[in-house]
Curated annotation (Swiss-Prot):
Keyword Transmembrane: no
GO biological process assignments: mRNA processing; negative regulation of DNA-templated transcription; negative regulation of transcription by RNA polymerase II; RNA splicing
Motif mapping: Nuclear localization signal: 231-247, 288-296
The keyword Nucleus is annotated on this UniProt entry: yes
GO CC annotation terms, alphabetical: centrosome; nuclear speck; nucleus; protein-containing complex
Gene (UniProt): CIR1
Database matches in Pfam families: Cir_N (PF10197)
Protein name per its UniProtKB record: Corepressor interacting with RBPJ 1
Role: May modulate splice site selection during alternative splicing of pre-mRNAs. Regulates transcription and acts as a corepressor. Recruits repressors to the histone deacetylase complex (HDAC).
Compositionally biased tracts (Low complexity): 258-273
Region (Disordered) residue spans: 213-460
Subcellular location: Nucleus speckle
Highest rank taxon of the organism: Eukaryota
GO MF annotation: an example: histone deacetylase binding
Length: 460
């Protein structure tokens, strides 16, 4: 359960992923590679033979010229067998390898490690007996427990290798091992000046003799004095260090003060910059206010022009009084004065008309504001329906401010009713008294106004 289709198919003989088919493919690849190697070896052998023939021709050999050299040369396979016989038997690491059977691919290769059944294999070599399979500290070694001198005496019989320490060190270096220097020690030489004996001068020193002559108590006193002197020296050193620290701190403070002064100068510079900025802003504000004043007080400029015109008149009058003889000139000047006076009168009339219109408009706006305030007060106190109707009309008139004040007056006169007249009288009375009347008086007035309005309606 749960296995894939490939796992099912790889168990079939015809499937390429089966083990038998993979093995067949691998065997075929190995055969092809083996054939290629053989062909390469034969090709190299042929090339070597050709080179030897060419060399012999150059040397002037007559056999080669006649073409009979092949009769005096051995076949290609005979050379390998001769080489094996000359080399002799290969040295095996272990004794069991001499008779052990090996496969073809592992026969010539000694680096392959064998793992025979039931035999312990250790790829280690002993330093003393130079045999594979154990170490010099193992009991298997025949030279176990023997020192270097005893081992050398045993091996001097010719049964084994020499065990001299110098030879052992050399063999270890050749085999890739090395001993530590603490084991080897220093390579001492007799002529080395460091190995020479130096005559001791301690006996001749007067200080040593003096110390030897002192008793134990005197020695203790000396030690105490020396301790005191050392303590004094330490105190002096501490004081010097403290003074140096204080000097460093004072220098640091001075540096801080200088830096703070520089920073204050910078801040003063920045404050001066801010002052200049504020001055610029004030100047801009003044210019703006001047422009507004020019727009607002254009009437003042007109009054100034009138003053200038008066000065001109006075000058002309003086000229007239001075020149009595020239009548024609006097007439012309009089005409000019009349023209100036007429122009000034027209200007004054226009300015006064504008002022009157403005004052009327302002008065009307003030009246509207007062009416709105009184209406709000009436609503709070519970006013009559007639007053509410009049307030609606007044609101409608407020919503259309584009109309001129004359038209508004005409419309108000048309839409005026007796109830509104009484309401306006009440407003005037309240404005005159300064809104000091109480609620009781207000009710009485409203009753009177209502009665008056009824009488007027009856008369109509």
């Amino acid at each position: 359960m749960g296995k894939s289709f490939a796992n099912f198919m790889c168990k079939k003989d015809f499937h390429p992923a089966s083990k038998s088919n993979i093995k067949k493919v691998w065997m075929a690849e190995q055969k092809i590679s083996y054939d290629k190697k053989k062909q390469e070896e034969l090709m190299q052998q042929y090339l070597k033979e050709q080179e030897s023939y060419d060399n012999r021709l150059l040397m002037g050999d007559e056999r080669v010229k006649n073409g009979l050299n092949f009769m005096y040369e051995a076949p290609p396979g005979a050379k390998k067998e001769e080489a094996k016989e000359q080399e002799g038997e290969t040295e095996y690491k272990f004794e069991w390898q001499k008779v052990a059977p090996r496969e073809k691919y592992a026969k010539d290769d000694m680096n392959i490690r064998d793992q025979p059944f039931g035999i312990q294999v250790r790829n280690v070599r002993c330093i003393k007996c130079h045999k594979w399979g154990h170490v010099n500290t193992d009991r298997e070694c025949p030279l176990f427990g023997l020192s270097g001198i005893n081992a050398s005496s045993v091996s001097s019989d010719g049964s084994g290798p020499s065990m001299h320490p110098s030879e052992l060190i050399a063999e270890m270096r050749n085999s890739g091992f090395a001993l530590k220097q603490n084991v080897l020690g220093r390579n001492l030489t007799a002529n080395d000046p460091s190995q020479e004996f130096v005559a001791s001068e301690g006996d001749d020193d007067p200080e040593v003799e003096f110390l030897k002559s002192l008793s134990t108590k005197q020695k203790q006193k000396l030690l105490r004095k020396l301790d005191r002197l050392e303590k004094k020296k330490k105190k002096k050193d501490r004081k010097k260090k403290k003074q140096q620290k204080k000097k460093g701190k004072s220098k640091h403070k001075k540096h801080k003060m200088s830096s703070s002064s520089s920073s204050s100068s910078e801040t003063s510079g920045s404050s001066s910059d801010s002052e200049t900025d504020s001055r610029d802003k004030a100047a801009q504000k003044k210019m703006y206010s001047k422009k507004r004043k020019k727009g607002k007080f254009s009437e003042a400029s007109s009054s100034d022009s009138e003053g200038k015109a008066k000065t001109r008149k006075e000058k002309l009058y003086e000229d007239l009084s001075s020149s009595h003889g020239n009548k024609d000139k006097d007439r012309e000047k009089y005409r000019l004065l009349k023209q100036d006076s007429s122009a000034e009168n027209s200007k004054r009339s226009s300015c006064e008309g504008e002022r009157k219109s403005k004052s009327r408009y302002q008065r009307e706006t003030e009246r509207k504001e007062r009416d709105s305030r009184s209406q709000s007060a009436d609503e709070r106190r519970g006013r009559s329906p007639c007053t509410s109707h009049s307030s609606r009309r007044q609101r409608q008139t407020r919503k259309s401010p584009s109309q001129s004040p004359g038209e508004e007056r005409h419309r108000k006169n048309e839409t005026r009713s007796p109830s509104t007249d009484g309401h306006r009288k009440e407003k005037k009375y309240r404005e005159g008294n300064g809104d000091r009347c109480s609620n009781v008086e207000y009710r009485e007035r409203s009753r009177r106004s209502r009665s008056r309005s009824r009488e007027r309606k009856k008369k109509r």
